[in-house]
């Protein structure tokens, strides 16, 4: 699968990412690096440990990485979760975590 095909599968905007990063090799390298990024794992661990502050940081980081890489679905869901966690007064409904998990899995599976 080409990097363009990957972005089509995940519903991302390859041209926008290429414009931001300037070189296809950089896009490819950062997408591959995402496969080993532990931010989503940290988010899940924070949720399991009932650590709202760490969950907020992980969701915010995931949102930023996803936005930079043009993972639009993951950006949208991570952004919604980040805003629900921002007050750091408790966890939102599980649907927010589930939505992030589904989009994360979709990117990883592609």
Model-derived features: where do they sit?
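Two-component system phosphorelay core
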Residues: 1-57, 61-110
